[in-house]
């Protein structure tokens, strides 16, 4: 499958054919490898050895495996290491890791020498199905997440589902938030498949894992191709649940609450917000909530990071979200499972507060 300027490959083992795949995109064999500490430990030696066997010249950069690595100071340090290693425009950058590495590496590639090619090698479910696809790369600012960045399409997105077998269950459930999102916003049949084969997917059983990853990547790429720079509102539908999620993440200080966990909570809020004005039927609301009830969170997380929050403070935190215009929040809502739309009219603060209340009540009664 292809997006405007990238190619997505789902294959195991994908790294052993990276030289051949680079050639299809006209990429040279001088590559900066960006890892986080975890991916360097788990996969670094195998990736480097495989690439060197295929004739690559590589240098490696390693950052801490945390959201705070997406910062100006970290980027500045990496620029310096690349300059000292004589990296010029003939090089490319491969991001091996999750969303933090992909965002940070994409940001650096977009800005270094006014732009060098970037390749994404995602190693988490969330990155494989969402953040590595579509070319939106950014770092954080103390006043908000992903506020400073670029559109910089990866030349290649190399997806190997086998990498997921090293992940703890918390990371799998976090990634499933984005997988489920695609069923909600674009594909009722995919939603039904996830409902039927949920246990197999979260246990990483084939062929269901690869089906879920491939379908998610296809939906994301298809939306990006139709609305690369978010001019029609279609690409914004990928942010279902994210307006609430970004507010939650900001209130957590971008620590101790994973992005996927925030998105899952946010989708519950968004389902209630879709239902309250009458857009989403009761039956679809119940089906959606039934699937989201199968998520698992660390003990006490929902209470600490959502149920105990002040609702008004959460709404104010949401106002820093990128999906607002002139302090008017825009929400991605559903009118049925499998179809989303962008809505920025007639949604009052009272509506939002009530949706948060409904979600809090649901989480409490569901025993999270």
Curated annotation (Swiss-Prot):
Identify which top EC class this enzyme belongs to: lyase
Query: Where is this protein chiefly located?
Result: cytoplasm
**What is its pathway?**
Metabolic intermediate biosynthesis; chorismate biosynthesis; chorismate from D-erythrose 4-phosphate and phosphoenolpyruvate: step 2/7
Q: What is its EC number?
A: 4.2.3.4
* A GO cellular component entry from the record: cytoplasm
Which Gene3D superfamilies does this chain map to?
3.40.50.1970, Dehydroquinate synthase-like - alpha domain
Which residues participate in NAD(+) binding? Answer: 99-103, 123-124, 136, 145
What function does the entry list? Catalyzes the conversion of 3-deoxy-D-arabino-heptulosonate 7-phosphate (DAHP) to dehydroquinate (DHQ).
Q: What is this protein called?
A: 3-dehydroquinate synthase
């Amino acid at each position: 499958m292809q997006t405007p300027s990238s190619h997505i490959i789902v294959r195991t083992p994908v790294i052993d054919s990276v030289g051949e795949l680079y050639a299809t995109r006209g990429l040279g064999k001088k590559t900066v490898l960006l890892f986080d500490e975890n991916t360097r430990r788990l996969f670094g030696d195998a990736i480097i050895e495989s690439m060197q066997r295929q004739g690559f010249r590589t240098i490696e950069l390693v950052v801490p495996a945390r959201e705070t690595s997406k910062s100006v100071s970290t980027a500045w340090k990496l620029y310096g290491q690349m300059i000292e290693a004589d990296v010029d425009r003939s090089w490319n950058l491969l991001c091996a890791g999750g969303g933090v590495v992909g965002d940070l590496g994409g940001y650096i590639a977009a800005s270094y020498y006014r732009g060098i090619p970037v390749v994404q090698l995602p190693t988490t479910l969330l990155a494989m199905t969402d953040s590595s696809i579509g070319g939106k790369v950014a770092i954080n600012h103390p006043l908000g997440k992903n506020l400073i960045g670029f559109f910089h399409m990866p030349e290649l997105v190399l997806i190997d589902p086998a990498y997921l077998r090293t992940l703890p269950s918390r990371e799998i459930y976090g990634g499933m938030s984005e997988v489920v999102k695609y069923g909600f916003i674009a594909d009722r049949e995919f939603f039904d498949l996830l409902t039927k084969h949920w246990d197999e997917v979260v246990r990483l059983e084939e062929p269901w894992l690869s089906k879920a990853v491939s379908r998610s990547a296809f939906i994301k790429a298809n939306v990006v191709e139709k609305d690369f720079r978010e001019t029609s509102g279609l690409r914004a539908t990928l942010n279902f649940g994210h307006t609430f999620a970004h507010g939650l993440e900001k209130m957590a200080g971008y620590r101790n609450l994973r992005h996927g966990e925030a998105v899952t909570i946010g989708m519950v809020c968004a389902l209630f917000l879709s239902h309250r004005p009458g857009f989403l039927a009761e039956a679809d609301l119940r089906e959606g909530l039934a699937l989201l009830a199968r998520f698992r969170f660390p003990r006490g997380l929902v209470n600490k990071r959502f149920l105990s929050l002040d609702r008004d403070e959460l709404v104010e935190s949401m106002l820093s979200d990128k999906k607002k215009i002139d302090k008017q929040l825009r929400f991605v809502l559903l009118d049925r499972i499998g179809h989303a739309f962008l809505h920025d009219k007639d949604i009052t603060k009272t509506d939002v507060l009530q949706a948060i209340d409904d979600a809090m009540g649901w989480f409490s009664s569901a025993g999270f």
